[in-house]
Regions:
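N-terminal type II signal-anchor transmembrane helix
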Residues: 1-72
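Short pre-catalytic segments that frame enzyme active sites
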Residues: 79-91, 214-220, 243-252, 331-336, ...
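Bacterial peptidoglycan biogenesis and beta-lactam-recognition machinery
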Residues: 98, 108-121, 134-140, 188-193, ...
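Extracytoplasmic/periplasmic proteins that interact with beta-lactams or build/remodel peptidoglycan
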Residues: 40-43, 60-75, 139-147, 152-180, ...
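Conserved catalytic neighborhood of penicillin-recognizing serine enzymes
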Residues: 134-158, 297-302, 442-511, 536, ...
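Proline/serine/threonine-rich low-complexity "mucin-like" segments in extracytoplasmic/periplasmic regions
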Residues: 710-767
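Peptidoglycan glycan-strand catalytic modules in the bacterial/periplasmic cell-wall system
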Residues: 67-276, 492-496, 503-507, 519-521
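A penicillin-recognizing enzyme superfamily signal
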Residues: 345-366, 375, 388-391, 396-425, ...
Length: 767
């Protein structure tokens, strides 16, 4: 950072030289002649060398319409505002959309000879000189054009992050005054008076909290627009620029002085013929407080309406991560806060509201369990993210770090989008396996040999060597095997052993490839399944790293007859001139055979309607055919995913998302209800059901009970049994094999018990 030049003492000689420079600019030789006076103004020393370069007008953006403007985020209807983003709260409007009273009030207050001088007000300079240096009463002599120039220079220095330029643009120095004169004269030659007035009315500060421009001021103080400002309102706003923080009328303690300053402006307007005596009297007799309708300031995701803080944060991350909005993250952030964007998102206000209500009703934020619930919903066939539900309030402040009810991390999304590292989801994953199974040419009603012990070599494929380890598999409900069992029944009963048998036949690579087709990627790294540490047999029972949003998107494929779409949060973004900015595409495409999807939907529904199914509690109201799959990852996380065909897909996850291993969801009371064992059906499925019922009722979603008709080629039955690893045998051979396996298993278990007894005995002897 450069050293600021020392402020030069104002001697009488230098003040006189400055006055002559003003006169020369305004009357005689213009810019060129004024340069001969600069040595007298600055002096010929090292300070001058630091100051004089700042007098150059090259590289200054004179465009009176090019100003930083706030961006506004909207819900999917394009009209419901969610929040705004700005460094300077400004909304540029043309002069024709600013009331004549507002224009007149500013001219009366700041520069009564604005329409007659050439950029520098000679009379104003002499008046200021006399008042300041002869009577000791500091007076400003800058014309309205000069004030506009000053604001432009300050703004450009801020945007360039140039502290030296900021010093020259804002410090009370002779250099600044002369430079403003030079530029003002040039501006008056390039732009008309109305254009300069428009620029000033849009750039000037009209209050605290970074409030700039008359449009933002009109909305803030009077809940109106600049073109509707009346005499009293205009005078109030015009008075603020002299001291934006002290005269801000939204601050109650400022109001007496603000009213006094307003009345001064009204008097000037009357003296200069802008308002009549009667209008003046009526205006000054109007109490300021009676005219105000102060609106709250809204900026950033913490100010988002409709409980959309987490959704807003997701959108911001999408903008900052998308090259469509700039080359670098810094460029994209500047565009967001200064570009005047209209951001139309995919947010469904009803969905988002109901998601959050359901989340907090299921587990209150202050619940002693400390458990969290995370929900995400997607519109099938579009990729549109409808909303998120968390039993936390979005809060990006440091105070939230010690408050379990508040958080800024959206655990529903990937790490790069402001979320976590992903979660294991248990049996909610199993429909992926079934899609892969059918894509490999198999039927969901094929009889499979199952076991509780599998050699990892059985799952080998071109990207997985398998090895010689043993994978021990159990079923949470039966704690054993059903042998033989079909993939459809294995899904309905949520049996892990059947998933393992399927994997031994088609291999892990096929399942990983299908997961990629459906839209799976690692929440932490973004990699496909076969490129992560999750690429092991346990992935078939949901040991993966996936976000709830990704799972909602996968269930959306099941809900849209096999159309896969990437999640999107942006429908349309336009710049300040109304031009469309390209937004990330959902890349929707047919990825799975519709007959496979229909068969899968039938199988998922069996989980709900069968008496031995794992998802009966998810049944929706009004006889609506229900498609939901529960899941439990050990005793750490419980889940449910499901959909209403072609309408909505939702995924729910419950647990301590920050410490699932250290804080299991077992032997614990949640919202006053105790269970020694929690699973997807005890809390995640009821939450899913409650939300889906509420959303279906709110939106009056049609009932489509024809969805989920199994295709013959994927649901054919067979009298043979497919062995583990492939191959066929008849039912009699299968039963014999089962008895042999059971005897072998019992013998192995007996040997293991004997070995453990020997170890225990040895340990006792050692002690």
């Amino acid at each position: 950072m450069g050293t600021m030049p020392e402020k030069k003492t104002l001697t009488v000689q230098r003040v006189l030289a400055l006055v002559i420079a003003y006169i020369t600019l305004s009357v005689g030789g213009g810019v060129a002649a004024s340069l001969f006076l600069l040595p007298a103004v600055f002096g010929a020393n090292s300070v001058a060398k630091a100051v004089i370069p700042s007098l150059s007008v090259e590289g200054i953006d004179f465009d009176v319409t090019s100003l930083p403007q706030k961006s506004t985020m909207y819900a999917s209807d394009g009209t419901t505002k969610i929040t705004e983003f700005w460094d300077q709260n400004r909304e540029v409007v043309p002069l024709k959309k600013i009331s004549k009273y507002m224009q007149q009030a500013v001219v009366a207050r700041e520069d009564r000879r604005f329409f007659t001088h050439g950029g520098v007000d000679v009379q104003g300079v002499f008046r200021a000189f006399v008042q300041t240096y002869m009577k000791g009463d500091h007076q400003g002599g800058s014309s309205l054009t000069q004030q506009y120039v000053k604001n432009v220079l300050i703004l450009q220095a801020q945007q360039d992050d140039d502290p030296i330029a900021q010093y020259h643009a804002s410090e009370d120095t002779i250099a600044r005054k002369v430079r403003e004169m030079l530029i003002s004269v040039q501006m008056e030659k390039q732009y008309s008076k109305p254009e300069i007035l428009q620029g000033y009315l849009n750039i000037a500060q009209f209050g605290g909290n970074s409030l700039y421009g008359v449009q933002a001021a009109a909305k803030r103080y009077f809940n109106t627009t600049a073109d509707q400002l009346n005499i009293v309102q205009s005078a109030t706003i015009a008075a603020i620029t002299k001291n934006p923080n002290a005269y801000d009328p939204s601050v109650e303690s400022n109001q007496p002085e603000s009213e006094k300053q307003r009345n001064i402006v009204l008097q000037l307007m009357n003296e200069q013929g802008y308002i009549s005596d009667a209008e003046y009297q009526e205006a000054v007799n109007t109490p300021l407080a009676d005219t105000l309708d102060v609106q709250p300031i809204s900026t950033g995701c913490m100010a988002a309406d409709y409980d959309a803080g987490y959704f807003c944060d997701y959108v911001v991350h999408k903008i900052l991560n998308s090259k469509e909005f700039g080359k670098t993250s810094e460029d994209r952030e500047r565009l967001l806060k200064e570009g005047g964007l209209k951001i139309v998102t995919t947010l469904d206000i009803d969905a988002n509201t109901l998601l959050n209500e359901t989340a907090r009703n299921t587990i209150p934020p202050e619940d002693s369990s400390g458990m969290e619930i995370v929900m995400a919903s997607v519109k099938p066939g579009t990729g549109e993210v409808l909303g998120f539900g968390l039993n936390r309030t979005y809060d990006a402040t440091e105070a939230a770090q010690n408050d379990q009810t508040r958080d800024s991390m959206n655990y529903a999304v990937d790490r790069e989008d402001g979320g976590g590292m992903g979660f294991s989801i248990g049996s909610s994953w199993k429909p992926v396996n079934l899609v892969a199974w059918m894509e490999a040419g198999h039927s969901v009603n094929e009889n499979l040999q199952t076991s509780t012990r599998y050699s990892t070599s059985l799952f080998a494929c071109d990207r997985y060597t398998g090895g010689t380890d043993t994978w021990n598999v159990t079923n949470a409900i039966t704690n054993g095997t059903v042998n033989p069992e079909t993939p459809a029944l294995g899904l309905a009963r949520s049996h892990n052993t059947t998933q393992a048998s399927m994997g031994s036949i088609i291999g892990l690579c096929k399942i990983a490839d299908t997961a990629t087709e459906l839209g799976y990627h690692d929440a932490n790294t973004g990699e496909t399944l076969d490129k992560t540490s999750s690429f092991v047999p346990a992935m078939m029972v949901g040991n993966v790293n996936v976000s709830p949003l990704t799972m909602a998107s996968i269930f959306a494929v099941y809900a849209s007859n096999g159309v896969q779409c990437d999640p999107i949060a942006l429908k349309q973004v336009t710049d300040v001139d109304g031009n469309d900015i390209k937004v990330p595409s959902a890349n929707c495409h047919q990825t799975v055979d519709p007959e496979i999807i229909q068969t899968l939907a039938w199988a998922i529904n069996q989980s709900v309607v069968r008496s031995d199914g794992a998802g009966g509690v998810a049944q929706l109201a009004n006889g609506r055919k229900t498609f939901a799959k529960t899941g439990t990852h050990e005793d750490q996380l419980v889940t449910t995913g499901g959909f209403i065909p072609n309408q909505i897909a939702t995924f729910v996850l419950v647990g301590d998302v920050q410490n699932p291993v250290g804080h299991p969801i077992a032997n614990i009371a949640i919202n006053g209800q105790y269970h020694s064992y929690w699973d997807g059906s005890t809390i995640a499925a009821p939450a899913w059901r409650d939300f889906m019922n509420a959303y279906a009722e709110r939106k009056q979603l049609p009932i489509d009970n024809d969805y989920g008709q199994p295709a013959a080629k994927y649901s054919a039955t067979s009298s043979t049994v497919t062995k583990i690893g492939g191959g066929k045998q008849n039912a009699t051979q299968q039963q014999s094999t089962i008895i042999q396996q059971q005897n072998q298993s019992l013998q192995q278990q007996s040997q293991q018990n004997d070995q453990q007894d020997d170890q225990d005995q040895q340990q006792t002897e050692d002690e």
